[in-house]
């Protein structure tokens, strides 16, 4: 008797996520469960598979909630590089809202770059922020999310 395959679950670091609507559409198409995690109530579609999780305010509270639950077969959507590193370490697929997939091979350099840029900003060497979110970013995100889901299905995870 074989064990029942694990379902693919999406976790969204939702407070500043610009692709929530796209996540809901993809989740509906693939019949996936989604945990929308935030420090404040966020409107979500009426769908039994989409779960709103409101955590206490405070640094990293939403990140901790997500990181403590994810494992292989889950997909995390976040722009937070330290959270991405924690989730990659736990075996989850991690995608930034701009479509960049974080993997074991790339997360170390990405985290180091983030830390360097944070230090430069703190020292006043860099005053600008990230570039504006674009339609190209949205399209890249949709492609990356679909690719991650298809890859997980091929690996035996279910919806």
From Swiss-Prot:
Domain of life: Bacteria
Family: Belongs to the UPF0178 family.
Protein name listed in UniProt: UPF0178 protein AZC_4000
